[in-house]
Regions:
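Extracellular/periplasmic carbohydrate-active domains that bind, remodel
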Residues: 2-473
Length: 473
């Protein structure tokens, strides 16, 4: 990595990011004469939500009025617009050909009543099941654009609290794995079986669950979005952008603060994911900033359908994010991961530069119904369906990591797999890693390191275990 590039990254790290104020009170976004949304003249083929009865006062439930504007716009492939204000709403469903414009001075605020999010067939956390719709849905539609400089706020703390309350009941019973499925929390934005969809320039706050979920979709662009999920608390499982069994996806210029994976590839869980067998493929992620998350770039843990042809570049990851590059799965997930390229990454005070953990979080990853529980939902059976070991261990190969700089790390590598399915053909080039410890690599074959500078303060080299043909260390 060049000196010039390092200087640019350090300058970006130091520069403050302008963010819309989030006070948690509706009066902070009261309409003003100077707001962009209020002052913009109405253009032809636009549909103003207040013409359909929306109030935008922060207390009235405006779902029906906004949906009426969307339905009208769909008839002419028009644009839905808002006057400045706070619009409280439940689930909205964007339709073919609609542009949905949330301008500066507009906040869409999610209802805190779960009844305002209708149940729909979808996939959640790797299995197909019925689940509450998201706040904004592109559900089996195409040619949709979601744009503007305004705010979409999930108002999700009530759902975070309900999750933690359930965990306090479930963890002592040995059913921690069920909590994420039983506590039905709305995602912020869902693209499901959608095509040719674009979201741009918006600020996304306080998702009740995942923020942007792209599932069974293709030709999707996420551009220049700000995600802030740690306002007023730290929302559990508030992933930033999840790309789930989808193809031809571009994510560019996302600035993310969340309390789980920031940029995440998914492809189904265990027996259900193996049944569906749809990969995530042809994905480009570039020029993103991760300020606080469980990991910067994540593959898994839902790997059953596999990943291929994924290119990640221009990523900056900062403390307190604990891991920069993460591959995670379990011995019941299965799936093939190959054709991954990760480049031009800068990490500042991120404890672990790269981790591969294929036995991740057993209390969540391995579902087993205790004998004393007789009455349970059908998806518990799906989750607990055994997967033969020969199908359950994932295979990782053909991973190329290059041009990475890490400053202030604790460990460079925490990489391991299973002896019966070692990691194969990983290439590392032009790495400059400043870490306390070099770390370890286990169950690896055909790993190559070229032009790698590893400044381990403990003076030890990478600990190689049960590996062969590892060159350049």
């Amino acid at each position: 990595m060049s000196i010039q590039r390092r200087s640019l990254l350090q300058a970006l790290a130091a520069a403050p990011v302008a963010m819309p104020a989030l006070t948690g009170v509706t009066s902070s976004l009261a309409p003003t004469a100077s707001s962009a949304a209020s002052s913009s003249p109405k253009q032809p083929n636009t549909y103003q939500v207040k013409d359909f009865g929306a109030k935008g006062d922060g207390t009235t439930l405006d779902t029906k009025a906004i949906q009426a504007a969307i339905d009208a716009a769909a008839k002419t492939q028009g644009t839905v617009i808002f006057d400045g204000g706070v619009y409280t709403t439940g689930s909205l469903f964007l339709k073919n050909g609609v542009t949905f414009r949330v301008d500066q001075g507009v906040r869409l605020q999610g209802s805190q009543n779960i009844e305002d999010y209708p149940l729909l067939p979808t996939r959640v956390a790797g299995i197909e099941m019925t689940w509450p719709a998201a706040l904004i849905n592109v559900y089996q539609e195409q040619n949709v654009k979601l744009t503007g400089d305004g705010i979409i706020d999930g108002n999700g703390k009530v759902f975070w609290d309900s999750y933690w309350n359930l965990r306090r009941q479930y963890d002592p019973k040995g059913i921690r794995w069920a909590a994420d499925y039983d506590c039905r929390r709305p995602r912020l934005i869902q693209f499901f079986e959608a095509q040719n969809v674009r979201i741009e320039n918006l600020s996304l706050y306080r998702a009740g669950f995942w923020t942007v979920h792209i599932c069974y979709s293709q030709d999707v662009t996420v551009y220049n979005v700000i995600i802030r999920n740690n306002e007023g608390g730290r929302g559990p499982s508030t992933d930033g952008i999840d790309i789930d069994s989808s193809r031809k996806v571009l994510v560019e210029k996302a600035d993310i603060t969340c309390n789980d994976d920031a940029l995440c590839m998914k492809a189904g869980r265990d027996s259900d994911g193996l049944r569906v067998s749809r990969p995530t493929e042809d994905v480009v992620i570039r020029d993103c900033i991760i300020r606080d998350a469980a990991a910067g770039v994540t593959f898994g843990s839902e790997t059953s359908g596999g990943f291929k042809n994924v290119k990640v570049s221009g990523i900056k990851v900062y403390h307190p994010t604990p891991v920069g590059i993460l591959f995670k799965s379990a011995q019941t997930r299965g799936g093939s991961i190959s054709g991954i390229e990760i480049s031009d990454v800068f990490m500042q005070d991120v404890p672990v530069v790269m981790r591969v953990n294929l036995n991740w979080y057993p209390a969540y990853s391995y579902a087993k119904i205790p004998e004393g529980i007789k009455d349970y939902p059908g998806y518990w059976k799906t989750l607990s369906t055994p997967v033969p070991k020969e199908r359950g261990i994932p295979q990782l190969s053909d991973v190329y990591v290059h041009d990475v700089q890490a400053v202030g790390a604790k460990t460079a590598f925490e990489i391991s797999a299973y002896p019966e399915k070692p990691l194969k053909n990983f290439r590392f080039e032009r790495l400059h890693l400043d870490a306390w410890a070099a770390g370890s690599i286990a169950n690896a074959e055909d790993f190559s390191f070229k032009d790698v500078t590893l400044l381990s303060l403990d003076g030890k080299s990478v600990d190689l275990k049960q590996s062969k043909n590892v060159r350049g260390l």
